Amino acid sequence: MKVILASKSPRRVEILEKIVKEFEVVQSNFDENTIDFKGDVEKYVKDLSRNKAIEVSKRLNEPSIVIAADTVVFQNGKVLEKPKSEEDAFSMLSSLSGNTHKVYSGICLINTYDDTVVTDCDCTEVKFSELNPRQIRNYINSGEPMDKAGAYGIQGLGGAFVERIEGCYYNVMGLPLNKLYKALENYDITIL
């Protein structure tokens, strides 16, 4: 059975390559703005990942396992997704500075052969060091934060701001590896 990653994220591709040797990337065209956050972060990221997987699975013509994910940063009751502008990134990074936040990733696997759907969610707590405005501006000028939830990438330059994490590192990158591995064990595909 084919494995399809419903994501254009190079980080998700890199993570999936650790456990699945052969898969295809098919970008989801699901409009994430059609789902509003209503207070339950786990439900929100699961719903987003499920809808991404459904959209891709409808375009496939052969039995496949479709994997989709969605990641958000959550702090003080607010969801921080990808910044819309450099000012938005500055505001996000300023709020993360010196504080702890949580990163939630929802995953969804759809077996197109029998239409079974599996969803799960992981949460990682991240503590940022204090950042001054110059450090934040320099980071924004690198371009790195503009396509990442919460305006930082732990695997890149943004990792320098992280004092500690509690939970799955790969979850912060966008795909909770351990949860995904456990979910994939239920299918007849070669992993590891």
UniProtKB/Swiss-Prot annotation:
GO biological process terms on file: nucleotide metabolic process
Top-level enzyme category: hydrolase
EC number: 3.6.1.9
Cofactor field: a divalent metal cation
Subcellular compartments: Cytoplasm
Active site per the UniProt annotation: 70 (proton acceptor)
Catalytic activity annotation: dTTP + H2O = dTMP + diphosphate + H(+); UTP + H2O = UMP + diphosphate + H(+)
Gene Ontology annotations for the cellular component aspect, listed alphabetically: cytoplasm
Site residues by UniProt (Important for substrate specificity): 11, 71, 155
InterPro entries: ITPase-like_fam (IPR029001), Maf-like (IPR003697)
Alphabetically ordered keywords of this record: Cytoplasm, Hydrolase, Nucleotide metabolism
Predominant location category: cytoplasm
Single GO term (MF): dTTP diphosphatase activity
Its job: Nucleoside triphosphate pyrophosphatase that hydrolyzes dTTP and UTP. May have a dual role in cell division arrest and in preventing the incorporation of modified nucleotides into cellular nucleic acids.
Record-stated family: Belongs to the Maf family. YhdE subfamily.
NCBIfam families, alphabetized: maf (TIGR00172), PRK00078.1 (NF000867)
UniProt cross-references to HAMAP family, sorted A to Z: Maf
Name assigned to this protein: dTTP/UTP pyrophosphatase
